[in-house]
């Protein structure tokens, strides 16, 4: 009998996804808005992003298909492969970014060379992959409990031991841009969530638990980053830990949070690759992705990822919008064609619209209006085609 994951196990997986150095670093940007507006942007952005994340997870959970297999239902067997390739590329990028950030922060506490930390983190991710998602139970529970306690200590140091410092607000960083930066993080997990909800005993409940846990933890991480910049005047998390005397404990936060998050990226890259080439074994592709990501983290500087996050949004926001329209509104059956050109053209229109909206300062960012308009376009096109057939 196939082993299924419990609600608790799914919650742990997405807790690990949320506890991330990259999320803390992204949170530091929000200090430019001040605490009140910064917190509002974090909450609004995560609410938008997590609703989309939930809907994507429900599609995969109900159909028992991986994220990229569900994409084929809307875009055709070959059209879906286009998104699988784009997803693998973004996951290789994420793997490299996460290892780079983790190694940089770990090096700030215990200096042995950036490349050494890249290799250590990369090796631990490979161990996580080889253990496998359905066998991680007790290992993940211990790691998550330790991370949670240490993160609370970090929160206490920042918010209760620090004092507000003079932080120069950035007038060019608008509330809408901040919302978009908050939406971008849950949106980046959108092409992955079904890889985990499809394995759940209760897929819809597991999706709800996963989304809520990730949303709360991710907001908390953003808040820690923003608080670090506002209350300590320091955006380098490693230095905050050093000054607080966390030392080895801080090192553990950095290394294990990087491992538990990046494991999901590499694992899903493997699952997505199975949608491109049926003969590939996802677990071994995930190992290869980790190796490539480790090399990338050693060789290339990856300090500013905002453009990368916006690129992810422009590709995957209109993609899930088409899927939401097909699955929940139009209730279309699986596309039997190689390329569903109609949906691919709607996605392209959504992609272009997102890039255009990036030049317009909108209060709620560009993801929400882009997705609403893309869904509306799907419904209109379906109605017009239905009339022609009638």
Label every model-predicted segment.
Residues 80-112, 259-275, 318:
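Hydrophobic transmembrane alpha-helices that form the core helical bundles
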Residues 170, 321-390:
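C-terminal membrane-solvent junction of multi-pass transporters and transport-like membrane proteins
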Residues 1-37, 135, 174-179, 191, ...:
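Membrane-interface "cap" regions at the ends of multi-pass membrane proteins
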Residues 28-58, 72, 79-81, 214, ...:
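Extracellular loop-to-transmembrane helix junctions
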Residues 116-158, 169-170, 207-214, 309-321, ...:
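Membrane-interface loop-to-helix entry segments
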Residues 29-32, 58, 97, 101-109, ...:
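Membrane-water interface regions at transmembrane-helix termini and the short interhelical loops
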Residues 13-17, 83-88, 109-132, 144-155, ...:
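Transmembrane alpha-helical segments of multi-pass small-molecule transport proteins
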Residues 29-40, 44, 104-118, 134-143, ...:
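Transmembrane helix-loop boundary segments of multi-pass membrane transporters
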């Amino acid at each position: 009998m196939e082993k299924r994951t419990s609600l608790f196990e799914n919650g742990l997986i997405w807790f690990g996804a949320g506890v991330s150095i990259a999320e803390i670093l992204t949170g530091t940007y929000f200090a430019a808005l001040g605490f009140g507006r910064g917190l509002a942007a974090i909450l609004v952005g995560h609410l938008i992003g997590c609703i989309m994340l939930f809907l994507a997870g429900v599609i995969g959970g109900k159909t028992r298909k991986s994220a990229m297999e569900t994409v084929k239902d809307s875009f055709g067997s070959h059209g879906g492969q286009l998104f699988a390739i784009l997803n693998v590329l973004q996951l290789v990028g994420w793997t490299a970014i996460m290892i780079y950030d983790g190694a940089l922060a770990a090096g700030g506490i215990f200096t042995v060379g950036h490349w050494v930390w890249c290799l250590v983190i990369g090796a631990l991710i490979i161990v996580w992959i080889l253990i496998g998602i359905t066998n991680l139970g007790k290992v993940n529970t211990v790691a998550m409990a330790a991370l949670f306690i240490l993160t609370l200590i970090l929160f206490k140091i920042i918010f209760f031991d620090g004092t507000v410092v003079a932080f120069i607000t950035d007038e060019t960083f608008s509330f809408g841009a901040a919302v978009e930066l908050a939406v971008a993080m849950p949106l980046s997990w959108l092409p992955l969530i079904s890889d985990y909800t499809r394995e759940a005993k209760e897929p819809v409940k597991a999706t709800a638990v996963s989304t809520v846990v990730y949303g709360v933890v991710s907001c908390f991480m953003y808040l820690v980053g923003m608080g670090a910049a506002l209350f300590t005047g320091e955006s380098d998390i490693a230095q905050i830990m050093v000054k607080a005397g966390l030392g080895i404990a801080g090192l553990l936060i950095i290394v294990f949070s990087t491992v538990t998050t990046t494991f999901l990226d590499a694992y899903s890259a493997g699952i997505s690759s199975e949608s491109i080439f049926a003969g590939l074994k996802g677990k071994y592709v995930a190992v290869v992705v980790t190796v490539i990501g480790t090399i990338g983290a050693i060789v290339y500087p990856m300090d500013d990822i905002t453009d990368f996050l916006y690129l992810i949004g422009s590709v995957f926001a209109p993609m899930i919008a088409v899927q939401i329209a097909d699955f929940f509104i139009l209730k279309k059956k699986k596309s039997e064609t190689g390329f569903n050109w109609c949906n691919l053209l709607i996605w392209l229109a959504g992609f272009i619209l997102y890039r255009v909206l990036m030049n317009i300062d909108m209060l709620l960012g560009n993801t929400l209006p882009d997705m609403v308009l893309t869904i509306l376009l799907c419904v209109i096109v379906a109605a017009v085609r239905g009339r022609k057939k009638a």
